[in-house]
Amino acid sequence: MFSESAAGMPSSSRFASLVLALLLVLPAAASAQTIYSYTDENGVTHFTDRKPDTDIEVRVQRATPEPRTLLTVRRTGPDEAPVWWFQNRTQGPLAVRVDLADAFNVVSEPALPGVFVLEPGSERELVTIGAFDPRRSWRYQLKTETVPGRPGARHNPEQPYRLPLPPEGEFLIGQAFGGEFSHNEPANYHAVDISMPIGTPVHAARAGVVMDKARWFSSSGTRRDYHGHRANYVRILHDDGSMAVYAHLDYNGVSVRPGQQVRRGQVIGRSGNTGFSTGPHLHFVVQVNRDMQLVSVPFEFQGPNGEAFIPRAGRRVSAVD
């Protein structure tokens, strides 16, 4: 959420004080941290933010997580008639709700509240604010909320989803729809957690366009308020407006870029153990923007004989190309 406060005196004094605060659903970049990397006897490279207790050569580097800002806001125009511009930092549609709070003697064009959809990577002039009576003082707070995706999108896949796994090996579904540990909110109720070793290739379950990503987080834990927004992930937009999220990816474990078209079965990254997590696994969920709320939707995977199945906790699964 973005919140801006402004107050003005009569226009003859041409005075306005602005206090800006950026409060996003997703946090801004974290401070730089030390990353240790080493290659074990099996040839697997590990990344950690704790110094490893090993005799193997360890490399040390500094990394700063990328900003995860979905929206930037800037002001132009004179103090007595500020114009607010909004830029979508993702490569998919972004819905923005704009509203006025604590407003006195203020008029806006267009009238607020309102919901606007910013196209991928676009910037638009959305709101102009001014005093209703220019002879009197005025004040307001401009508040915004952002939700990825186009409101009203309907999930309508043409075929079951491909399991987001490499074609060899079996993997255990540790948590499925409505899982008690963490699948208990609208955004992740219809999600699956698939246990897999760190560094396992993650494949696109459905074709689409990479909308957003994060790749520089390196730690995990169970403090939801801290770790909940610190997972590496890829968000892919589908042709029906739904979006798939592949989360808890490894440090620097994203191999696609925003705006890139990906095909079903393409490798998009490596599994990991970042963010709100108790162990290495892949979190997979399909979401839509429903009335300015991210809501997960039920889906089916393709089984070994081409049949569709609903994921269940405890089932061992294999991908089929």
Regions found by a protein language model. Give the residues of each.
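N-terminal secretory signal peptides that target proteins for export/translocation
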Residues: 1-13
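Acidic, glycine-rich catalytic/binding loops that coordinate metals and/or anionic ligands
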Residues: 156-177, 203, 226-229, 254-263, ...
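Short histidine-centered loop motifs in beta-beta connectors
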Residues: 197, 203, 238-265
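Short, cationic interaction patches enriched in Lys/Arg with P/S/T/G and frequent prolines
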Residues: 2, 29-85, 89-125, 130, ...
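Bacterial N-terminal signal peptides
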Residues: 17-27
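Active-site loop architecture of trypsin-fold serine endopeptidases
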Residues: 217-226, 271-283
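Short hydrophobic beta/alpha edge segments that flank linear recognition/processing sites
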Residues: 234, 263-275
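Surface-exposed, glycine-biased beta-strand/turn segments
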Residues: 115-230
